[in-house]
Amino acid sequence: MTSPTVAVVMCTYNGEKYLRQQLDSILAQTYPIQELIVQDDCSTDATLAILQEYEAKVPFIQVIENTHNLGFNLNFKTACMRATADLIAISDQDDVWMPEKIQKQVQAIGDYNLCFSAHLRGERMETAHIVSSQYAPEALLFAGIAGHTMLVRREFLQREEIWVDKFFYDWSIAVGAYLYDHRGIVKVDEPLNWHRSHENEAALKQNLDLFPQSKKKPTYQPYLYGFRNYRRLQQKPNWKRFYTFVREHSDPSLYPLLHQMATLMLKNDVISLLKLCRLCMKHRQTIYPVKEKAQGIRGMIRGFFYPFIFSYRCSTFDLKLEFNL
């Protein structure tokens, strides 16, 4: 049996500061890379020059320069469509991969649509904390899986229908991994890359712009302001689009909890909200983002109020993310 081929897809925009370190960590992988596709979204710094330098030295690197700015969502979609290998690994421009990242994910993916891993997150690798996401179908109603941790089957990733328009690409891919072909997701529960948190991070900037008053270490705020934001988000077109997509594409016989919860999140009455809270409390071990915090009485309280905790600083449904050219 032949080993599957792997493509790495990276999208760049003004990433000169950390780009070399990330490229070097990809080139140092213990598993062979068939193609490294890097698509630059009209950078104004030295990013393109760095990419062209690597392209001249490494035969399997292909650099594409966009003629106009696409934004990160459409940039990743169009870049992924260029890949020809069996499996596609998604890469940010400012991470660092562990040498065995691809090898361990190739060994784990089996017949699944998607394999992801835990990762390190922080300003410095030495002080970074481990992020290990939940990935049950119902957990993906509240939070996606980081794209930079993903290894995805190409025939699945290049299906047009998994790219939910105006929504974060990696979140829609994760949900689609269950809804299409029903192959689902597998996890390597060890950190295989370091994801930098720094002042230029796009998601961080967007969050601070939308919630300038939010607390770094909140206490009561998620319970109070989270409810208000939950009701506000329910009116957003992106909210309705995403949860309608999940409800319409989830088979109730295969994913009854996912289907039921997506339906409740589309309803505005108090009874539906209480039912949703009760389900979150009951299934908190597979839904709440940090398993350790879902234990005991406090865990039950967190589980019940998780729709509000999730909504407290949720900017996903406020953003305008296009997939159309």
Residue ranges and their predicted role:
Residues 81, 135-212:
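Conserved nucleotide-sugar donor-binding catalytic segment
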Residues 100-128:
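Conserved donor NDP-sugar-binding/catalytic core segment of glycosyltransferases
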Residues 167, 179-185, 191-325:
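C-terminal subregions of glycosyltransferases and related glycan-biosynthesis enzymes
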Residues 15-28:
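Short, well-formed alpha-helical segments that are part of the catalytic scaffolds
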Residues 88:
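Short aromatic/hydrophobic "clamp" motif used to bind/position activated sugar donors
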Residues 66-83:
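Glycine-rich, basic loop-to-helix element that forms the pyrophosphate-binding segment
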Residues 40-49, 68:
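A conserved acidic beta->alpha catalytic loop
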Residues 4-7, 35, 172, 176:
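Cell-envelope/extracellular polymer assembly enzymes that use nucleotide-activated donors
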